[in-house]
């Protein structure tokens, strides 16, 4: 079923911006990855409907992706003051610490990742556990284009047109039992292809882990994405399969997923394990709850430069409050951040 997202949550694909300002993330991950850098180059992408967006390169797609595109449900719903971030900027300003700590590292290093073949393990409190080849994993679902805001915890944001399907559709198919209260996600651990996982300076205990409460995972806005900008996901953006939860800070939208587990207890997520006072389990976008070292009241919508700042007020739940606020009814969102 096509989810019709209200206009205040949608963005027009006809408006395009670019981004030039790079902001280094906090120094928590520390030292340089110099000497470990891999050969640069964009990963294999897919022929699709990339002519809808400027500057999108064309590279042949795997058969399963090409077969699904003709039935894709494309969206283009206008909202005042929003603009889609250009493809090049969205693919060259990333946090993906498996490939390095700096914003340009994923685009430079992620070409080393071999995203084919790929399999996903489904386990835990489900009636249909198993290990699925990606093409079989995606086969039952019709792709939809979802134009979502992406708000990073670092107080910058983008607008990205994703291609994917509702996470809820997958969860229903694997038949969670009554003990399933949370969903835990796990990123690939393959240090021979992910330079960041080889660094002795990283504070991350690989593999990267994330989690959602079951009702959050079942919400129709939460999707599993396999593409963006009318084509296959680039490696640096989480190929071949990533989570997108638009009302939460970007680190919740885990990339390069290899395992989805339905569990009884709230999972301990990666950033929560590193600094729970800075990165809570819920991580809902909230302008009233600051990061300990910076304000969350405003954000830089990329592009944004010293002499041409593109700064705007941050919206509660990233502008999706009318859809998701009821999930947190009665909760103290200053405590459960």
Swiss-Prot record:
Signal peptide location: 1-48
Principal location class: periplasm
Catalytic reaction annotation: L-methionyl-[protein] + a quinone + H2O = L-methionyl-(S)-S-oxide-[protein] + a quinol; L-methionyl-[protein] + a quinone + H2O = L-methionyl-(R)-S-oxide-[protein] + a quinol
Cofactors demanded by this protein: Mo-molybdopterin
Co-factor binding comment: Binds 1 Mo-molybdopterin (Mo-MPT) cofactor per subunit.
Entry's localization field: Periplasm
Top-rank taxon, per record: Bacteria
Description of how the protein assembles with itself and partners: Heterodimer of a catalytic subunit (MsrP) and a heme-binding subunit (MsrQ).
Function in brief: Part of the MsrPQ system that repairs oxidized periplasmic proteins containing methionine sulfoxide residues (Met-O), using respiratory chain electrons. Thus protects these proteins from oxidative-stress damage caused by reactive species of oxygen and chlorine generated by the host defense mechanisms. MsrPQ is essential for the maintenance of envelope integrity under bleach stress, rescuing a wide series of structurally unrelated periplasmic proteins from methionine oxidation.
Designated name of the protein: Protein-methionine-sulfoxide reductase catalytic subunit MsrP
Organism: Pseudomonas aeruginosa (strain ATCC 15692 / DSM 22644 / CIP 104116 / JCM 14847 / LMG 12228 / 1C / PRS 101 / PAO1)
């Amino acid at each position: 079923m096509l989810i019709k997202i209200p206009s205040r949550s949608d963005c027009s694909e006809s408006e395009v911006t670019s981004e030039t300002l790079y902001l280094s993330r906090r120094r928590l991950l520390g030292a340089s990855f110099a000497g470990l850098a891999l050969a640069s180059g964009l990963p294999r992408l897919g022929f699709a409907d990339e002519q809808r967006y400027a500057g999108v390169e064309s590279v042949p797609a795997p058969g399963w992706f090409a077969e699904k595109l003709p039935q894709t449900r494309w969206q283009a719903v206008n909202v005042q003051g929003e603009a889609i971030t250009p493809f090049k900027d969205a693919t060259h300003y990333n946090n993906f610490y498996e490939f390095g700590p700096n914003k340009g590292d994923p685009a430079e290093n992620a070409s080393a990742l071999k995203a084919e073949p790929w399999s996903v393990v489904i386990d835990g409190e489900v009636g249909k556990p198993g290990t699925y080849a990606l093409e079989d994993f995606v086969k039952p679902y019709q792709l939809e284009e979802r134009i979502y805001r992406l708000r990073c915890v670092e107080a910058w944001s983008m607008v990205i047109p994703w291609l994917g399907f509702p996470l809820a559709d997958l969860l229903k198919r694997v038949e969670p039992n009554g003990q399933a209260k949370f969903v835990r996600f796990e990123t690939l651990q393959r240090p021979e292809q992910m330079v960041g996982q080889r660094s002795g300076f990283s504070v991350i205990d690989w593999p990267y882990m994330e989690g959602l409460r079951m009702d959050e995972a079942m919400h129709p806005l939460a999707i599993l994405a396999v593409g963006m900008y009318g084509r296959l996901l680039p490696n640096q953006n989480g190929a071949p399969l990533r989570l997108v939860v638009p009302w939460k800070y970007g680190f919740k939208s885990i990339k390069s997923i290899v395992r989805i587990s339905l569990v009884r207890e709230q999972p301990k997520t990666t950033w929560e394990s590193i600094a729970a006072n800075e990165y809570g389990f819920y991580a809902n976008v909230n302008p009233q709850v600051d990061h300990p070292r910076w304000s969350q009241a405003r954000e830089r919508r990329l592009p944004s430069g010293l002499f041409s700042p593109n700064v705007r007020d941050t919206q509660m739940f990233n502008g999706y409050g009318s859809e998701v606020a009821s999930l947190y009814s009665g909760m103290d969102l200053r405590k459960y951040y």
